[in-house]
Design a protein with these regions (language model features):
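N-terminal pre-domain segments of enzymes
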Residues: 21-82
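Bacterial N-terminal signal peptides
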Residues: 8-16
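Bacterial N-terminal signal peptides that target proteins for export
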Residues: 1-8
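Short, well-ordered loop/turn sites that connect or cap secondary structure elements
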Residues: 100-103
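Short, structured beta-strand/loop micro-motifs enriched in basic residues and often containing a Trp
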Residues: 79-91
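Sequence context surrounding c-type heme c attachment/ligation sites in exported
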Residues: 21-33, 97, 115-339
Length: 339
């Protein structure tokens, strides 16, 4: 018998034996030690989050999820996942951020292009260790076969879905803390009950992965459903909550601005209406108020959103271009305010 045929025959016999004994060949489990240990794994594959990294096919106990209103990053597609260790579950805390057990992980991959042209750029992971959360960025290779740890970050030239050529920035490890920080501690910022679908949370509840369905769940609108006939205020407030409030809130990285752009904030002055900036400068564009009712073009908030120039642009990190759709919704919200 030729060697190749002998190997094939052996494989068939082995498979037949496994089937005869009721053995199911399962993919390797997620590497809990890589998540909870002290080391920083050099490659994304060491975690075992995906059965197929290129296809972003999640492994067992890795759950895909989506946000009603997602954070905008130069038009990148975001593929979001959470991993929960065996027997662990999420805990709902009102409409706010879900509480994750130690050993959990949050995974987010950034991609550009569609179909066969889709290119994975980076995957960011948040690891919940005993001492707190750790944020690590991983950069995908050109072959799309592996992502390697990029503690120093990096830049990639690419074209956005809007056709704009940009230098896309992968944040370094310390820059991850700029957004993922409150009161000096690294925290998740995305999976809040108010910004997750009731269907997804119901599925997690049924699977024993969520302790309860909290009141106030899914109160933020689905951004993809916005039309010119939609009320501007809830969409604008949701956009500001997701894109700005991780810094602009008490305890956030920009709390000294005095702005609190969280969804639940109801004080008009706190969200910028008729509020003068704490510190002026070219970032104010010569304007006097963060939000001037009825006058979007005289509002500092919109001026900074509508810029990609360093020192003016807001957010400071995570974008190299302007989100025209986001600007349009916030512009309409301000324009429709009573003077």
């Amino acid at each position: 018998m030729r060697p190749a045929r002998a190997l094939l025959a052996a494989a068939v016999l082995a498979l037949g034996g496994a089937m005869a004994h009721g053995t199911v060949l399962e993919p390797p489990p997620v590497n809990d030690t890589a998540i909870a240990g002290a080391a920083f794994p050099k490659t994304l594959s060491e975690f075992g989050f995906f059965q197929d990294g290129r296809a972003q096919d999640p492994a067992a106990r890795v759950h895909a999820y989506a946000l009603n209103t997602p954070l905008w990053s130069d038009g990148a597609e975001k593929l979001r996942f959470i991993y929960l260790p065996e027997g662990a579950r999420l805990t709902a805390d009102g409409e706010g951020l879900l509480q994750f057990p130690v050993g959990a992980a949050i995974i987010k991959t950034f991609a550009f292009g569609e179909g066969a042209e889709r290119r994975l750029i980076e995957t960011r992971v948040l690891l919940h260790r005993a001492e707190g959360w750790v944020a690590l960025p991983y950069r995908w290779n050109a072959e799309q076969t592996e992502a390697t740890l990029a503690l120093a970050g990096g830049r990639i030239d690419l074209t956005t879905p809007a056709g704009e050529a940009i230098s896309y920035a992968i944040p370094n490890k310390n820059q991850c803390k700029t957004c993922h920080s409150k009161d000096g501690a690294v925290i998740p910022i995305g999976p809040k009950a108010r910004n997750l679908s009731v269907k997804w949370m119901g599925e997690m509840l049924k699977a024993g992965r969520l302790d309860r369905l909290p009141p106030g769940a899914a109160t933020m609108p689905v951004w993809a459903g916005y039309t010119d006939q939609s009320p501007a205020e809830p969409f604008a407030r949701a956009y500001l909550d997701v894109n700005c409030a991780h810094c602009h809130q008490p305890g956030g990285g920009a709390s000294n601005s005095g702005l609190d752009l969280r969804w639940e904030q109801s004080d008009p002055h706190a969200i910028g209406i008729m509020k003068r900036p704490v510190a002026a400068g070219r970032g104010a564009g010569g304007h006097d108020f963060s939000v001037l009712p009825g006058q979007p073009d005289a509002s500092i908030l919109l001026y900074r959103m509508d810029s990609a120039e360093p020192g003016i642009a807001m957010p400071e990190l995570g974008k190299a271009s302007v989100d025209k759709d986001g600007v349009a919704v916030v512009r309409r919200w301000i324009a429709e305010m009573q003077r």
